């Protein structure tokens, strides 16, 4: 399969109602995969509804009876259509394989700009410095989950920021850590290094509230080489939390003691300084056509983000080691035009005791988790869904390289 064509795997319906419903013509041998389209649709607002089944194998089963009856009727009325897409983190393609050529652009009514710029940007930094918040601001949509806990991001999340004159493709990477406790940690650092290998320039995000430190060691820990040979911008985040005088001192320190091209202070939470970052990136990106259609916000399909939403709710609801011991897999995603989409999710933990904590007394905790997840999933997809959640024990999954590769760490993500 040619890489340029691999980027075109989409099956448009059903899309978010306010977004483009244009379909790209595909060769007949391609397997369709719904790719997230559109921008500025946030998944943080909660709505009320129903449609959750929570069960842990051989441990807990709780079903809302009315909802089950409704779903059975819907199943009879409309047979389920199951899509099992391959979720890929595609490496940076050759520019001759860019997605849209001049003819295709004319067909789609989007003529190529003579000075159009496009390229890849790796976003690096230590855990909990605001990398994901920054990318969400730049893309205009919540793609990466955000919590107050470090090391929330595990995969290399791709976000696409497009305007008529440019296309910026951003890699949100896991936080760079010094000590790798599990095989999972080393696989996440592999994702960081692969992002650098695909990039045209690099953003290194630092916390303005913390004592300034040289980024050479961080680059060496995360990338394996402090001399990466790419333009580097140091993004000093959380400037809203310190006094202007302190910001000036830290800017001076970083400019003096770090080997970066520029330093820009921002507040990713409020979007302050984000336009300055875009301007800097565009000054470094080469001229070239868009790699993706302009209405696509990420190359990951919807089921990937469904799993991330559930994982975010685990981080919010549970404490200490529990969120870090969980792996969320979307086992089944069935799109049903005349009924609610059916989504089956499994949560893997490493110990029986952890499963008990996830479930809670009489299954109350897992039901709360599933309900919160469903509400955000419905808001994200802009449609009602029926969510089933299972909790299973998979001992030492964080040390199992075969499983980690299957779950998408250190390489491609494959649907289960």
UniProtKB/Swiss-Prot annotation:
Residue ranges of the region described as G4: 237-240
Effect of loss of the gene: Very pale yellow green leaf phenotype. Virescent leaf phenotype.
Domain Era-type G stretches: 117-287
Gene Ontology MF term list: GTP binding; mRNA binding; ribosomal small subunit binding; rRNA binding
Source organism superkingdom: Eukaryota
Signal peptide positions on this chain: none
Presequence positions on this chain: 1-53
Residues at which GTP binds: 125-132, 172-176, 237-240
Primary location group: plastid
Family to which the UniProt record says this protein belongs: Belongs to the TRAFAC class TrmE-Era-EngA-EngB-Septin-like GTPase superfamily. Era GTPase family.
Function text: Nuclear genome-encoded probable GTPase involved in ribosome biogenesis in chloroplasts. Plays a role in 16S rRNA maturation in plastids and may contribute to the assembly of the small (30S) ribosomal subunit.
Annotated NCBIfam families: era (TIGR00436), PRK00089.1 (NF000908), small_GTP (TIGR00231)
The protein's name in its UniProt record: GTPase ERA1, chloroplastic
């Amino acid at each position: 399969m040619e890489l340029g064509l691999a980027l075109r795997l989409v099956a448009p319906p059903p899309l978010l109602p306010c977004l483009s419903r244009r379909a790209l013509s595909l060769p007949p041998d391609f397997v369709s995969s719904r790719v997230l389209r559109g921008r500025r649709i946030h998944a943080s607002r909660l709505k009320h509804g129903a449609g959750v089944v929570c069960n842990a194998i051989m441990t807990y089963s709780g079903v809302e009876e009315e909802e089950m009856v409704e779903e059975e009727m819907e199943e009879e009325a409309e047979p389920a259509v199951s899509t099992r897409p391959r979720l890929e983190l595609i490496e940076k393609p050759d520019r001759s394989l860019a997605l849209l050529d001049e003819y295709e652009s004319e067909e789609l009514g989007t003529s190529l700009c003579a000075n159009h710029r496009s390229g890849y940007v790796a976003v690096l930094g230590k855990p909990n410095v605001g990398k994901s918040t920054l990318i969400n601001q730049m893309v205009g949509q919540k793609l990466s989950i955000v919590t107050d806990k470090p090391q929330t991001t595990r995969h290399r999340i791709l976000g696409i920021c497009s305007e008529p004159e440019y296309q910026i493709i951003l890699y949100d990477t896991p936080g760079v850590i010094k000590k790798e406790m599990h095989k999972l940690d080393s696989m996440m650092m592999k994702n960081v290094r692969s992002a650098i290998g695909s990039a045209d320039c690099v953003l290194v995000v630092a916390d303005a509230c913390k004592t300034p430190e040289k980024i050479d060691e961080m680059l060496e820990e995360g990338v394996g080489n402090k001399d990466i040979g790419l333009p580097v911008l140091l993004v000093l985040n959380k400037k809203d939390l310190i006094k202007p005088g302190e910001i000036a001192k830290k800017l001076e320190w970083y400019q003096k003691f770090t080997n970066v091209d520029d330093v820009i202070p921002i507040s990713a939470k409020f979007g302050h300084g984000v336009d300055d970052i875009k301007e800097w990136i565009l000054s470094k990106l080469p001229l070239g056509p868009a790699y993706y259609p302009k209405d696509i916000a990420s190359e990951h399909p919807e089921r990937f983000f469904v799993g991330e939403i559930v994982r975010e709710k685990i981080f919010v609801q549970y404490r200490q080691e529990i969120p870090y011991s969980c792996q969320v897999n979307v086992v089944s995603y069935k799109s049903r035009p005349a009924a609610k989409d059916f989504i089956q999710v499994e949560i893997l933990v490493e110990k029986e005791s952890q499963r008990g904590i996830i479930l809670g007394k009489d299954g109350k905790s897992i039901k709360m988790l599933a309900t919160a997840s469903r509400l955000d999933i419905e808001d994200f997809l802009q449609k009602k869904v029926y969510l089933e959640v299972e909790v299973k024990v998979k001992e030492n999954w964080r040390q199992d390289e075969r499983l980690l590769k299957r779950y998408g760490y250190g390489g491609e993500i494959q649907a289960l």
